[in-house]
Amino acid sequence: MPTEAPPLVVHLVYRFDTGGLENGVVNLINHMPASAYRHAVVALTEVVPAFAARIRRDDVQYLSLHKPPGHGVKLYPRLLQLFRELQPAIVHTRNLAALECQVPAALAGVPVRIHGEHGRDAHDPDGSVRRYQWLRRAYRPFVHRYVALSRELAHYLEHRVGVPPQRIAQIYNGVDLTRFDRGSATRFAPPGCPFSDPALFVVGTVGRMQTVKAQPLLAQAFVRALQMQPALRERLRLVMVGDGPLRADAQAVLDAAGVRDLAWLPGERADVPDVMRGLDCFVLPSLAEGISNTILEAMACALPVLATAVGGNAELVVTAGKGQTGRLVPAGDVAALAAGLIAMSADAAAAVEMGRAGRERVERQFSLRSMVASYQSLYDRLLAERITTRQPA
């Protein structure tokens, strides 16, 4: 007698390409037992094959809808047909750009409809834009459960969008503690990086170079730190890994200051753990964040963190006391970021101790195993409730 196939989860995103949100989908699919759920990834715009190749399961279906800019109401008939063909047990949309897809999912009778809030963009860094609040309220009746990646986002959903707290699950991102590991107390430069001298203090960041990530601000802060303390030219170095529209801007800042040879901007790299192991301090200059995967990855690699005080960063980085893991500075404040770079580089021993505390913190609270178990438990529970009641949650 043939075995019944596991329930299907459709993960619906705007674009399936390099990014923290998308990497979370990859981790979820790769580490959730195949016997529990099948998966499909639907991108409103495009599934990028090179990124999709990170998924190790060969039974995952990928669909690109090539949506033009603007409201996606013209896609509703196609999505309605798609959901009826795929017959998913769960549709899981992520962030505002995909939220409207809850409407055709509801019309298709999808049993469980989940929406994840992973963070904000540069147009609404603090969640105060009323139009975005209104849009979320408009689609609220179509969503059974929300997943907020941080306590700050859960508070936003409850108090700005009006979602009852019992309909919000707060699940932190998790990090692969085996893949992201310091491995050695010694810093090793990744292939191609010119900063192998152990006497150097190497600061760096990893991420797509777009407005919300604000990498040019880090380049400006690096230049400012060297201007404030010229002796740092002998040992302070900058690594900025990633590609995107702001890469040229960041490089231009460094070139204009005459410090091109003190920085390395190699573009996008697949060997992110090796990049992390080539740093002494991880820096995240973002204007907005949910729960940053790269902060968690840096902490797993025993790196101290210098980040902006936005979104869920304060929930990750401990800034005082015995278990201090890093420092937080105001977003957009080049002077404060420069001061943070100087402070980190001035006390290498303290930086190492912060990194050690960070590794211990992610081991306790932010493991990938815990994240996957939380999502699987949510899927199981909601599906059981819907099968039992067949009533709106």
Regions found by a protein language model. Give the residues of each.
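A conserved mid-protein helix/loop that constitutes part of the nucleotide-sugar donor-binding site
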Residues: 19-27, 201, 205-227, 245-252, ...
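Donor nucleotide-sugar binding/catalytic pocket of nucleotide-sugar-dependent glycosyltransferases
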Residues: 141-185
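Conserved acidic donor-binding segment of nucleotide-sugar-dependent glycosyltransferases
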Residues: 316-334, 343-348
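A short, well-ordered alpha-helix in the C-terminal region of glycosyltransferases
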Residues: 343, 350-365, 371-377
